[in-house]
Amino acid sequence: MRWKMKARVLSNRRIASEVYEMTFEWKGKKPHPGQFLMIDCQGKTFLKRPFSVNDFEEEKMTILYQVRGEGTKNLSQMKEGDILEITGPHGNGFEILEGKRVLIVGGGVGIAPLLYLAKKVKAQKLYIALGFKRETFLVEKFEGLGEVVVTTEEGSTGRKGLVTSVVEEMIGEVDIVYGCGPKPMLKALQEISMKANVLCQISLEEKMACGIGACLGCACKVREDKGFSYKRVCRDGPVFWAEEVLF
């Protein structure tokens, strides 16, 4: 595969409970915000795992991940100097519209692709809403890029409640919304943006086996004029216009 390469781990640190930030050397193609990589997590797992590009600069790539199974557990144990086998970047990424009033919305580890987006978007005004259950992470990296609002479901940090409540309040002040997070959050973004007639792009998170559209394991249902069809999250996405997706 023409995107296959090896990369040396530069750092791998835990930034919250079971959430890690890994940086590694990158001499491959420059990613577009919203694209992802397929990484060999080694161990007994034989399928690569998808990880959004969290940040990129000066031949260094950063990913954000949560330990959820054997693959990510293996990844969390890697040290500086270890070698990763990677393919990518894959997918379409976000369509960046210049000169707009922008709202970026992230939920939990779904904030992963949004930092790089926030750095690259050329907005007239940039608002950033980050939602967490209780423990927050990476908020400081978003500060200074735009006007940041943080919510936690328990109210331990920032505003108490769901991040979608911020979207409901601000939807009339923006031209486009970009979001990534749990499906209930993305469905709420879809409903809020469509009701307000505001553009919205969402990045879907799905389990993937190949990352190139061959296995059809990440298919999602999308609207068609006469019903619905299926698109591949890895090849046709992972970013879709919100009104396309059928949850």
UniProtKB/Swiss-Prot annotation:
Cofactor(s) for this UniProt protein = [2Fe-2S] cluster; FAD
**Could you tell me what this protein is called?**
Dihydroorotate dehydrogenase B (NAD(+)), electron transfer subunit
- Coiled coil ranges (UniProt) are none
Q: Which CDD domains does its entry note? A: DHOD_e_trans
One Pfam family from the record: DHODB_Fe-S_bind
Q: Which UniProt keywords apply?
A: 2Fe-2S, Electron transport, FAD, Flavoprotein, Iron, Iron-sulfur, Metal-binding, Pyrimidine biosynthesis, Transport
UniProt similarity note: Belongs to the PyrK family.
Q: How is the cofactor bound?
A: Binds 1 [2Fe-2S] cluster per subunit. Binds 1 FAD per subunit.
Q: Which InterPro entries match?
A: Cyt_c3_hydrogenase_gsu, Dihydroorotate_DH_ele_sf, Dihydroorotate_DH_Fe-S-bd, Dihydroorotate_DHASE_ETsu, FAD-bd_FR_type, FNR_nucleotide-bd, PyrK_electron_transfer, Riboflavin_synthase-like_b-brl
Name the source's superkingdom: Bacteria
In which residues is FAD bound?
Answer: R49, P50, F51, S52, L64, Y65, Q66, G71, T72
What species does this protein belong to? Answer: Caldanaerobacter subterraneus subsp. tengcongensis (strain DSM 15242 / JCM 11007 / NBRC 100824 / MB4)
